[in-house]
Amino acid sequence: MTIGTSSVAVAPDFRFARPLELTLFALCVAQAVFLLASFADGLWLMAPDGSGKDTDFVNVWAAGQLVRDGHPAAAFDWTLHKAAQNAALGRAFESYYPWFYPPPFLLVASVLAAVPYAPAFAAWLAITLPAYAFTIRAIIGHRLGFLLACAFPGVVMNALPGQNGYVTAALMGGALHLMERRPALAGALIGLLTYKPHFGLLFPLVLAASGRWRVFASATLVTMLMAALSYAAFGAETWEAFIRSLSVVSKVALTQESHFRKIHSVFALVRALGGGEGLAWTLHGTVMAATVVYVCLLWCSRAPFELKAAALAAGALLITPYIYIYDLVILAVPMAFLVRVGRTGGFLPGEVAGLAAASLLILSFLGFPAPWGLAATAIVAALIIRRVHVTPAIAPIS
């Protein structure tokens, strides 16, 4: 099989213009002002009565407190975990934020719970946002990468609930950025990514298909070490509770109609439009299979590594049926690799506009909640495929 090429001209010697820099800076300031205004109105970090704001972060902090109290398995018990969330904020509230993470992430939660809720929330973002921003800057290879990273609308989408999208993006982007030069370290980052295993499904397939066994071995070793450490720290009971919770994850996230417009996957889109579960799984499975085949074949070709990395990162978002708006900060990773390619060889006509459109789709979720993230990911994936097919010297895949 051959991934073909064509001769579409690219704009030579692209330079980031001053107006673009100012625009990105303005977007960064706008997001910061939005968060500060939300804080002042009692919509972020702190509620109007001075208690902690109930967002996704209370899930992590409460689970960490249960660990510190000597009851790690209770994080998977909805009744006990909900009581811990109420205690964390000092008041009862209607929503519940369930704990679905593997036991190793309880180690992180327990550290965060060592300080009060609101400072822990702020510290979590203060640590993870720079990790994400430095990763995007490293991928792009230019100081403007910081502005691009922080101007991306996925930043505010992750900051509002205090979620872990920055961590996932930093681990995935860091692994791909280091894979050619530091395979063992890249594998270690992939191993750490198993704290959200549904975003790492493509990695073992791609690594095996392309014969990157050193990365594969490192990722496997770190995954096993994390599992062993959490087993030693929390015992078999916690792992058993986690395994039992897996069936609840699919039942809650993928069968309740109220969730469909919040999830940015092919499965959720079909269900939101009224399609049956069988049709939704069929279409999602088709997209998943096509993505896996294309990305694996691409990684076996002589395509530029930046395009391989971009395809894997975008593919990771397409194949999971379970992806929320805060996870879409990960989309900055494939976008960063495309920007890197554009910086060195010029951007294709419409490429910058496509990246901007994908960003605006994610931002639109604030005003009109819908699966815009899927459309944004599809745009970026299309830009990557276009790049692959116009880039010269891609060897046939046998």
Which residues does each predicted region cover?
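Membrane-interface alpha helices of multi-pass inner-membrane proteins
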Residues: 184-208, 312-319, 357-362
